[in-house]
Amino acid sequence: MRNKSKITTLESKFPLLSIEQGCMVSKDAEITVAFRVELPELFTVTSAEYEAMHSAWHKAIKVLPNYSIVHKQDWFIKEDYQGKLSDGGLSFLARSSERHFNERPYLHHAVYLFLTKTNKQHMAQQSNFSSLCRGHLLPKEITNKDEVMKFMEAVDQFERIINDTEQIRIVRMTEDELVGTNEKGGLLDRYFSLSEEGHASLEDIRLGADLVRVGDNMLCLHTLSDTDDLPTTVSTDSRYERLSTDRSDCRLSFASPVGLMLPCNHIYNQYLFIEDSDANLERFEKQARNMHSLARYSRSNQINEEWIQEYLNIAHSQGLTSIRAHFNVLAWSSDKEELRQIKNDVGSALALMECHPRHNTIDAATLYWAGIPGNAADFPAEESFYTFIEPALCFFTAETNYKDSLSPFGIKMADRLSGKPVHLDISDLPMKKGVITNRNKFILGPSGSGKSFFTNHMVRQYYEQGAHVLLVDTGNSYQGLCELIHRKTKGKDGVYFTYTNESPISFNPFYTDDYFFDVEKRESICTLLLTLWKSADEHITKTEAGELGSAVNSYIELICADHSVTPCFNTFYEYLRDVYRKDMEKRDIKVTLSDFNINNLLTTLKQYYKGGRYDFLLNSDKNIDLLSKRFIVFEIDQVKDNKDLFPVVTIIIMEAFINKMRRLKGIRKMILIEEAWKAIASANMADYIKYLYKTVRKYFGEAIVVTQEVDDIIQSPIVKESIINNSDCKILLDKRKYMTKFDGIQAMLGLSEKEKSQILSINQNNDPNRLYKEVWIGLGGMQSAVYATEVSMEEYLTYTTEETEKVEVMNRAAQLGGDIETAIRQLAIEKRNNKKK
């Protein structure tokens, strides 16, 4: 038989009456305005920023009228990451990543703020007057409408003050968020079920003398309700030793040990009771006089008088507001052994704050009941202590989890605390918000810091989101990824250019799929031919440039009109030798050999014509139009020191990207230059690098340079002037080996002390149970954080630059007829199984 008496009892005890105009109204005619609070991300806040947040809270609270209650409630709920395994559109590596992170545990953090207007009598009530101890609650009527209006005006002012700060944002909660809808439970539902689930079901609540139980969960309550429980000094923040060095500081809020650092289900309640400060101080004056008159009878009276006098002296000399405060940690578990461990963990966390942990079993029921959103006025007065606003605010939590970027585009990184995946947009959203003015990136990381893993991880996700990616490499770092894409697209994409004696690198600058040659394409062909003809220190006259341009235009007209002529360097050379030279001789206005020596041009270019030593270079018969290819790798390690080949290869690369940049409207394009930039950034290419970095942003593009040597940055004016100054996104990896040189790096990159501290914390406190490397990402000097590059085994085998591992993958692929995806899948399974043994 259904027991209806319990339901009736719960209904009769329920302290809230209704939601009116967005405010919660209690049966005692008290109104509460509820907010969601957004805090800054963990490990990204400096001491000065903690001070600024503290100051903002203080200013906001000062505008509230007497007999107001500030109740901040932080929820920390253990959850598991749910991978998007049912998404049919995921690539092989994206699905592997989702599977790797699936069910990764983390602590979900949500912050709520409740501002309640009560009265003097109710604020002074003790636990025996709680609504739990009364009979049926008869709703009272709000009688003083003027007080309500003044309170609501103060709340508006409070909201404006907080939202004027850069670090904190508060948003009023709607009725649906508080009481829920048919589809989703509200905050009140979740409080009575102690869960953050979408639609929580109400649980039976047992409020016993020795135990509070909500459903299957047993509650454990630790309180800070007496000055004897508090530390001798408090501050807005404290040094987090695990991520600090002798040259840098990592700061966390004073209350962080009972926040995200406490890895269990818990709610951290922070109460401030704003009373009539002058009346409080008058009462303390009276108490001090009484204690003084009784001091001769008891030393404790004398000590109490000294404490009261000190409190009064500070209040009057510094103009501080006397308030009451209370803080508690409400943790729970359905398992008794786990609850015992949680009890110890909470006690240890409070001890880290130099507080004396007090496990409260006497008032647990009334404190749980007072924690109901909108029911702070039911708080038992004897559980609070007198203090001032400033020290009380030091017990407010001031940081939260890493947040996903509110953008459809981005890359997946991992939270450095729990390893939960974080969706991070470092290109579009920062541009839209004005944080950066270009999408260019500068990446600096020593060998072995995880640089190649990060860049592989980034470009793979850019490619999968529709970007055109062109990579210039010198160490086969992208061979695995390129081969995987080539195989997956059946050769339509994933083009890998490299030089070997058996298969030398070759191009065809005259080939296009559609016979379309715009001005930039024609100019790039002319630049290529001039580079082949003249050395870097030779002067090019206007006549020479003009005649060569005319020859190129005439040849292009020929191949567009007569498709039987194969577009390539050989046919161009023949046209120049057999047709254009004769046309020049027939002209009325002769061009002398001193103005344009076509014979010298033909002689110089002959080595690239069939039969010449470089006849392979510009006569590729593969007919690849790079404009349509979305993933291209130029591996130039073998040619970067060849004075004849390298300038040609460089121009081909640049022409390919500029062609994409100008012709692909509305499509993202990226050029990433690894260590090859040192060769490309030579004197004759300096102007191109400057041009690229300054103009690429106008074409929805981004240029990225990767380097590992600090000295390269400091010594190269091109890097300093063109690359660094035009890269609003800076990405740095482990810099511990350069700690003594870091001041030079900091000055060169224009890093703040905050950014320096973050960078020097990289890999200082890595979880030994997870395989990852950390990376610092800074955006325009305004936003920065350290993230983890954590990948699945499949991604690891694709990205690895370790020779033995690459050979293992390629050998397995060869055994499978070139199927690199199956090879990676098989090896990943084998390696995971070996780890389990």
Describe the role of every protein-language-model region.
Residues 132-161, 353, 445-450, 798-823:
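Short, cationic low-complexity segments
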Residues 100, 516-570, 717-837:
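P-loop NTPase motor core of the ASCE superfamily
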Residues 1-399:
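Extended, folded cores of ATP/NTP-driven motor/assembly subunits in large transport
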Residues 85-90, 127-132, 374-377, 484-489, ...:
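Short secondary-structure boundary/capping segments
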Residues 23-29, 102-107, 317-322, 414-416, ...:
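Short glycine/proline-enriched loop/turn "hinge" motifs that connect secondary-structure elements
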Residues 47, 51-63, 355-356, 366-422, ...:
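P-loop NTPase motor domains
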Residues 427-449, 453-460, 469-478, 495-503, ...:
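Conserved P-loop NTPase motor cores
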